[in-house]
Amino acid sequence: MDEGSADAGASGRRSRARGSEAVARSAALERLRAIRDGGARAAAAVQVRIEAPIYDTVAEEDYAALVARRRKDAGAFIVDDDGLGYADDGREEDWTHRTIHSSSDEGSDGEDGAPRKRKQPRPQSKRPPQQSAAAASLSAAAAMMGKQRLSSMFTSSVFRKPGSDRGRDSSLAADSIVDDVIAEFAPDDNDREERRRRVGRVCAPAPAPTTTAHIKAENVAVDTAMAFRSDNVFEAHEVSDHGNDMDMELKPDVEMEPKLDTPLGASAELANNSNSLEEPKQEANGEVKIEKVHRLNAKIKTEDSRNGDMASATAGWMKICGDGDNAGGEGAVAANSNTGVDESSEFELKDGALPFYILDAYEEPFGANSGTVYLFGKVEVGKRFHSCCVVVKNMQRCIYAIPSSSIFPRDTISRLEKNSTTSDSSPSLRASLHELASGLKSEIADKLSDFNVSNFAMTPVKRNYAFERTDLPNGEQYVLKINYPYKDPALPTDLRGQHFHALLGTNNSALELLLIKRKIKGPSWLSISKFLACPATQRVSWCKFEVTVDSPKDISVLMTSTTLEVPPVVVAAVNLKTIINEKHNVHEIVSASVICCHRVKIDSPMRSEDWQKRGMLSHFTVMRKLEGSIFPIGLSKESSDRNQKAGSNVLALESSERALLNRLMIELSKLDCDVLVGHNISGFDLDVLLHRAQTCKVPSNMWSKIGRLRRSVMPRLTKGNTLYGSGASPGIMSCIAGRLLCDTYLCSRDLLKEVSYSLTQLAETQLKKERKEVSPHDIPPMFQSSGALLKLVEYGETDACLALELMFHLSVLPLTRQLTNISGNLWGKTLQGSRAQRVEYLLLHAFHARKFIVPDKFARSKEFNSTKRKMNPDTEAARPDEADPSIDDEGHHVDQGKTKKGPSYAGGLVLEPKKGLYDKYVLLLDFNSLYPSIIQEYNICFTTVDRSADGNVPNLPASKTTGVLPELLKSLVERRRMVKSWLKTASGLKRQQFDIQQQALKLTANSMYGCLGFSNSRFYAKPLAELITLQGREILQNTVDLVQNNLNLEVIYGDTDSIMIHTGLDDISRAKGIAGKVIQEVNKKYRCLEIDLDGIYKRMLLLKKKKYAAIKVALDGSLRENIERKGLDMVRRDWSLLSKEIGDFCLNQILSGGSCDDVIESIHSSLVQVQEQMRGGQTELEKYIITKSLTKAPEDYPDAKNQPHVQVALRLKQNGYSGCSAGDTVPYIICSQQDSESTHSGGIAQRARHPEELKRNPDKWMIDIDYYLSQQIHPVVSRLCASIQGTSPARLAECLGLDSSKFQSRLTESDNQDTSSMLLSVIDDEDERYRGCEPLRLSCPSCSTTFDCPPVSSLIIGSSSGNVSNPNEGNDASINFWRRMRCPRCPDDTDESRVSPAVLANQMKRQADSFINLYYKGLLMCDDEGCKYSTHSVNLRVMGDSERGTICPNYPRCNGHLVRQYTEADLYRQLSYFCYVVDATRCLEKLDQKARLPFEKEFAALSQTINLALMEVQKIRDRCAFGWVQLKDLAISI
């Protein structure tokens, strides 16, 4: 048998094997044909309209031949999908059976799960019925997705099958239906575009799981909020087919799909225009009617309504970019100018030494290069400045051994020095000193040998010590100086011996020694002598030039007669755009934008026209495609066009993230930038960049180009537990060594006071530009079109430009350079906000120059990171090994939760304010730099103050020799005074330069006191800090006494360094005259202290300590007035914008000067209007946003479940967003679920949502209006109106639509009137005296009914009303009880209901005991209505003049004080009330003799019943110490 017949035979056998099902199917087809050809049309027959044949009818032999031909051509029919198993073998599958397929890429089609199979199209062949079933829903999909897509051709009536029941059970999303149909055809360009979109949707993570619903033809509701979600997942509703063949179409003027180049970050804004969502509903005629359904009860700003008068940041950048002026051209030449200089170029030498301008320095603390310091800066070569690295080798440790007193006896030393002519420089003296120290040297040598130190040198030197270690002698003495290389191990800090007490300097870094010993103070010109240029093959850096010196003594500060030019620097602003990999919950980079500014001045500010001029800027962006996808059509051509137009590569397209990172590093290396700039670049961009380089296995010769040191191993990038402000982690700073890091996020927090420090907020408030926010979830859908991706490029470059512009706007580089030059630390540390290190280095330079041994800096220890501080700040005799281990390299305190302590000594004096509204002029006078002035005034210094052994505050120094601190401060003050004199005559940029210099001097001087009182400071000295604050309190009190007693003026408030004087005058000139008189009287008492007029207030509202608002008048005589707020809720960021606006309105009304009635009426009507707008959904969503800062990482909060901002941060972090670290500001809104039975289900923290969550799910959440009215608006307004007559918290609550009864607080003005000061004896009216007391509640012995027992005095009151003549007819229950002594509900004949004397006494005692227990529970509650923190624990923190135990634990978020909920006075009043209830004798005694007679007999009989109870409760009350006065405390024994 030949091959063809064999195949035919096999086919025949297979066809016969198809069995009864195939035969039945053939029979059914025959009946169908008969019906179609005009056969009997019975009523029961199925009516099927067939416009074209479904199957071909062929003979069995023809079918076998067809199968054989298919099998033969199977290989050419379809490609085997790279071996994934999808191929056609020519067989026809039985569609009535389910089959298992190896391909997971193709889903099932229809309810029977048949595979989608590709066939060669033939004119006579028809699509299987299953495709018709899928097409039944296609009309809805076409309506939803738009008719311009390829799938719209499938919506014709040919593919609709009436009466199908399958459509009801199908659960295919519209996108899947369209893709399934398209997959049946050969791929074309549109198909590829659709598959790219599908991949983009797969890469875009969904905010919430979207269930696929059925599509219902009679009611197609397209939720545009869902349709425009950033994840682009489509949610459709059910469609059911009916007998009528209904056409579904949308009105042509309704656009249901956003344009591809529309930024999808604006999805919620598009969807929620005018506070509504558009829902299309289909009517009977087949048309879809658009209805608006209100979802979110707040308005969401659209792009058009948002800051119409504010310039677009993107448009601003495009204008700067221009037509290529700043893209290539001179900027590109400047970037590549290094190419014309090679290593053979000669340096510009001066006197044989290399002038080198230092910018940064770095050392490797461990490893083979330990002790090697790398200096990075600029050198001049060929009339241009280029980068250079100076490698300083052979650094030596410098350790001081403090000998015992027997080594260098004082009398022996005195005799030797007297005999010596030139002190310790005399050879004979040095020989004698070596001889005296021979035993010490021998012991030290043995110790060094034990630690494998073989090469060392020792010499006796004279040094001073004046710091806090009590085990070391103060004053000048001889010590043993030890030098040995850094490559050898460090000696232990606690090493001691027979001949020495301690070793100091064991852990000092090589970099610190180099800066201090060589007197290098920040960016400056150095002279490098005896250097050796390194060839390119041996270099350890990426700098253009590199030299090596073998000794640090070859480096010195360059001293020239002429001032050398300060070299400009190259600044590169970097911005990354990332997407979130939900599987691993990490950020992946999709684009990186860099804007480079060449020749940036660092010695003076730069105007925008200077740094934006032609040739100053260059830019480029690197973008990669998403994994498994391709770039949109046309993007490659657009990239080429842009590059050609710019003359350089401004847009590079890469195939993978690894290629993107390589390209970025290469471009950064070409720029050779000195400064990296970015917004939150420390906390996000660099961290993501380096982690992705690590994950993508970018080679070390590439990723190390982010810095200037060549590296082979990436350092650890973990941030650890450092508090915010320390900037980037040590690992990141190690990677970028050689380049300065300017984070505008950190700088803005230091220099500005803003609600939020996001780039969007700062661009709006500081730069007056509107920034487009693009979240990681918005980016994947943008890969659908080239236009959207080009927008993404613009957004990335715009963000980089905004960070650059913010840096220039704040003059960050000139200001931080001045601070660094004053302090003498590293510029990079100053840029990272290391304020403590600035003061530390300032003192290190000062004390080293005076031959002092400085205190050791204790490094952090891992094993002690989470433990409490070992050194008790109250103990002066703390040993050095008990120092706080939580000091990091920058001197920042590690947040350790509850172990964190406040100051352990009293702070500044804060006087009790005279609260109220003042409508006459109020003067504010304050001392200029009080604490630095006190240091100078009283010569307070480490070297002059004698510390007391008992730990008490030391006395003022008697020494006339000026100490180091006063001398240092004096020089700073004189320099600032000189600069300010220059400032008066300067103009333009020179004026700005002087202003920056005087600001830097002021900041440095004012930071001096902080290092003394900060327990983690290297120069911490609690006795000095205590002495300074004590003098500050005395000075303020003396000033108040002088003003009140000598000048007869009223001081209404005082705080630390300032006082407020109420003049009682309406004439501002006379008020100024009073101020001048006060200044004259105060200043003549002091030498360095100086008080000055700081403000004149026309009207003031003084609420409480540190909280006031006033209208401030300009001091220059102009009529300018502005409202100044201190400590009010409106200036705190943890209140919503809505509450701040209402608070400002109320404040303006109160300070307006209008009548009290008009002010109250205006406030009440405004509150009514506001609550109506809020409940009506007319308030903008942005006004509900509350912002709070994270003080630690969100996962480190022990009470995270109760903190709204922490819950939001945890949710954001889980979804991969940035901005969730310690120090970040988190915005949130308190919401309630729309579909929840209870609108307040869950706590406040559980109902807090990020604003973007509301915009993405407007149909799920709604604003909790009641929360904002009761917790945000009411507390603010009630506190402002507390001193205004005519309103109350209950009345304000009523205006806000709240339950006024909830605001009838028992704790009424505890600040104004202490309940303990109210004497019960002076209040004659019992109702007033015992107002608020709980009644005596008795329980019936028979029926157990509880009822209130009236006072026995009710008998007299009731009888006076006419009930005494016939008591049995009296209707007063009070009178009936005392006469019946029975339960009011029980009949008189029931003896069991009688309240016996024992029952009355026992029940009264039990209730008295319950109130005593309530008192001893000691419940404390914060008096701040916005806080209401309650606790049973006592907080022993001391702040200012507040009593110990009264500081709210929520400080500094809350400035309230803890007050007892149930005080001694409350308990005594309650017990007194119980006595009053049963004291019949006292009631009779209060009556006149004539009025007493009718009641004596009745009361005498009643006394037998109540005397037992009275005696019991009186005994309890008399034990209460509150009711007694101790005379011994009032009198003095003689």
Curated annotation (Swiss-Prot):
ZnF (CysA-type) intervals: 1340-1386
Enzyme superclass (EC): transferase
Subcellular location: Nucleus
Enzyme Commission numbers on file: 2.7.7.7
Compositional bias per record (Basic residues), positions renumbered to this chain: 116-125
Gene Ontology molecular function, alphabetical: chromatin binding; DNA replication origin binding; DNA-directed DNA polymerase activity; DNA-directed RNA polymerase activity; nucleotide binding; single-stranded DNA binding; zinc ion binding
GO biological process terms, semicolon-separated: DNA replication initiation; lagging strand elongation; leading strand elongation; leaf morphogenesis; mitotic DNA replication initiation
Reaction equations catalysed: DNA(n) + a 2'-deoxyribonucleoside 5'-triphosphate = DNA(n+1) + diphosphate
GO terms for cellular component: alpha DNA polymerase:primase complex; nucleus
Ranges of biased composition (kind: Low complexity): 1-12, 127-141
Record-listed Zn(2+) 2 binding positions: 1422, 1427, 1448, 1454
PROSITE patterns recorded: DNA_POLYMERASE_B
Motif position, CysB motif: 1422-1451
Biased composition (Basic and acidic residues): 864-882, 889-898
Chain spans, region Disordered: 1-23, 96-141, 864-905
Superkingdom of origin organism: Eukaryota
Coiled coil ranges: none
Keyword tags: DNA replication, DNA-binding, DNA-directed DNA polymerase, Metal-binding, Nucleotidyltransferase, Nucleus, Transferase, Zinc, Zinc-finger
Xref: NCBIfam families: pol2
Misc. comment: In eukaryotes there are five DNA polymerases: alpha, beta, gamma, delta, and epsilon which are responsible for different reactions of DNA synthesis.
Protein purpose: Polymerase alpha in a complex with DNA primase is a replicative polymerase.
Family designation: Belongs to the DNA polymerase type-B family.
Name by which UniProt lists this protein: DNA polymerase alpha catalytic subunit
